[in-house]
Amino acid sequence: MQFKDEHPPYAWAGVAAAVLLAIYVATLSPTTAFWDTSEYIAAAKVLGIPHPPGNPLFTVVAHTWGLIPWAADYAVRINLFAAVTSALASGLWFLVSERWMRGIVPARWPRYAAAFAGVLAAGTAWTVWNQSVVNEKVYTLSMLSVALVVWLAVHWGDAEPGPARDRWLILVGYVLALTSTNHLMGVLGAPAVAVYVLWTEPKVILKPWAPLLGWFLTIAVFNHLPDLAHPGAGPTEMLVTVVTLALIVYAIWRDPKDQLAYLAVGAVLVGISLNYVYLPIRAAQYPPINEGEPIGFLSQALSDVLNRVQYGKPSLMDRQAPFYYQMATFLEYFGWQWARNWKAFAGIATGLFAFLGFSGLFGLWRSDRRAAYAAIALLGTLSVALVFYMNFKYGFSIAWDKFGNNVPREVRERDYFFMGAFAVWGVCAGLGIAVWMRTIADFTTRAGTAPARWAISTPLLALAIIPFFGNRATASRAHETVARDLAVDMLQSVAPYGILITAGDNDTFPLWFAQEVLGVRTDVTLANLSLMNTDWHLRQIKRRETPDFDATDALPYWKDRIKAGDVPGEAPGGGITKPTNPVFQWSIPQLDSMADLTPVAKDQKVTWDSLQITINGSYIPQGNGYYLEKSDLATLMLIHDNLGKRPIYFSITDAFHPDQVFGLRPYLVAEGLARRLYPAPVKPGPNIVTSPYIGYIDVNATDKLIWDVYHYQAVTRKRPFGWVDPPSGSILTVYGLIYASMAQVYAEKGDSAKARKAEQVYEGIAAQMPANGPR
């Protein structure tokens, strides 16, 4: 190719990365956020193991990154890690884009400008930007991996044939193996690499090292390496072993001295080692976050974590929603990317960028077929193939007017899975801008010199800033602190050495963050209703040693309550007596033996002292009876083992689960965001009143919490489009529930000033509800 010898513009790629990084830093989240953000930041801090597949590459790299004091706040450091990895990906996309444009725009500076326009559009696409300013997921690291392997393939395609060039492919294999230990999204650049290899030098696949590299990479990425340890276990294990031995024999037969063959196998094994070496070693040290407990190098627990068995996904042939609705959800997300905040103009912007992207692909097809097919393979893998593979339920908001909640839906929007597709489409839009710049330059031949003709076409570059201005109001995470504040507020609602039973991700992961990263109220034991259906979470609760409650460093709220003798377990001379009983009386083997479902009688009664529990089990037709889930049985055990020994609380976020399943409403009293369980039926009085919203309320405790402790200003903060993420908006309603309830209490007590103040907080929260934001 005529432009092959032109050196890659690494310096300008660095400039492009720096510009995107500046945008991300300016809109960076100052702390944690909802969903998986808190889990990943906390896991990085304690070198823990987050949810399957464990993401060891992220944990190790982010932990190392977090040791460097880039910022005083640890969460900001990890959020900055997301920003840097995304910006580096933009720099690599600049290199790829510039190389692909060489047959479209022969003039260097217009080409650089068009390549920059593409990466600016890609980097400010709504999902890419939103995920680059907070470490909600591990996908910015995966996107960096995709960009890297594509650039390595492009670079390999321009290199001279020979052993030196072959080493680039082995490097690609290493990167693919390594990034698979972060997330499988990172390997989705492989089809583009395959296009480059088969188009440029198809004979390379017959070299002895190449089949070994491809095969070992395949069995490593898809977690079949352990099959080699027990070849007789089944047909799959036998097949993996036979093919592996055959390829080794073939490589030795062809050239026993071929160093590249050994290098290829070694590269894959070293790259994948974080999965098979690091995970079991670290799990055996029982870090505070140890999801799945994948202890043992060839253990079933490790296999289950790597294969995500916990989630129980159905076969790809068993679609969780019709494929056309799954694609419709993807297209809905695509429509968010280019000007999400400009509601009236968003559709036009989507059409414009769709047109530019297709123009870019067509122009690339005309100028560089190899690159065009690679781009198509990459886009197809990151979009249609990924939609098919992920097999999601109906999107959270797709076809809501038609189906409402009458179809199985995802619990949240899943646009982040497709951020790679949106970034690559932004690059293609940059190619489209280059195509139309070339068209204008060719059309204006009478305008004089070539620089003058290119100058006439430069206004097209302004199209690339549309996503920046169209997305910045909601893609930005600057000033958003609700997740951190909720966690701190909820923990501070719990008495010293209390047990707090929570419901799901958004009311649990922030608590992990608050305890492990901020060091807030580590004396509180956390139990999650959803996670208590797993063995590992019950073991984690059992093993956890309760840190001391430092009364001297407590909030004034708790100092006052301790001084007034209003806290269980008060020790003589002040302070709080630390409980000595284990949270679970059962041993770990006994906890492991708990069945997933336990049969119970309909409305079965259980009485402990003055506490009477009415168990409302779920009727399961297959079992012809009523059953209690493992998590509910574990909850009963927590109550039985700790009632009168440790304060027990249920979070307000649990949707009144203990009321419905155990009939505990007469025993629960709200103290702000948490409801304390009492050992006997509660009697209303001057300080204990009834609210139609949440049942009994401790007025004095809640009054002090909501005005002296809680960060309600963070919730009522005005946002240009309200709370953007509807699925997590229920967290705001929890605050609203408390303040609305207290407004009623104040009104009934004749305190009109506080009633109005609480109403104003509620109204401020209601104004931010998801219905007011874009979807």
What positions do the PLM features span?
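Alpha-helical transmembrane segments of multi-pass membrane proteins
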Residues: L21-T31, V384-N391
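Extracytoplasmic catalytic/substrate-binding loops of multi-pass membrane glycan-assembly enzymes
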Residues: L28-Y40, P50-A62, V76, N290-I295, ...
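Phosphate- and divalent-cation-binding pockets in alpha/beta enzyme and binding domains
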Residues: V60, F509-F513
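Loop-to-helix entry region of an early transmembrane alpha helix in multi-pass inner-membrane enzymes
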Residues: P56, I68-G91, L95-V96, R108, ...
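N-terminal membrane topogenic signal
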Residues: Q2-V15, P110
